[in-house]
Amino acid sequence: MKFFRLIIPCAALMLFALPMAAQKPEQQEKQMMEFIDKEVKRLTDVLGLEYWQEFYVDSTLTHDYHAMSDELQKLQSAKVENTDLYITIRDKWMQQIDDTYKRIFTEEQWKKYWKSGAQRAQKERDKRKK
């Protein structure tokens, strides 16, 4: 169950990141911000984030998801069909988010986050790197 709490946001991100090129920019932005807001709320509820941590999580997700989306759109615009490249970009940005979370969260929050599925996601990213 905990695994799905992490995988569902990642899957949702991929569901809106790849078909974004067919949407209007306003729709893309709205959809991304709704996703980010839900993820911040989820992390706040699960980890008991303080206000300043919520701010940093929101800022991190906003920056990194936009950057990841831009990279994915560039690949899509170039008509790249190699799915491994899309996965590599997603993994790079998810690793960046986890690295930032580790600096933001307390040790207790990090352990809780790590056990809630982040550790499994990290192992999967590590497998794909090999």
How would you name each of these model-derived features?
Residues 23-130:
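Charge-rich (acidic/polar
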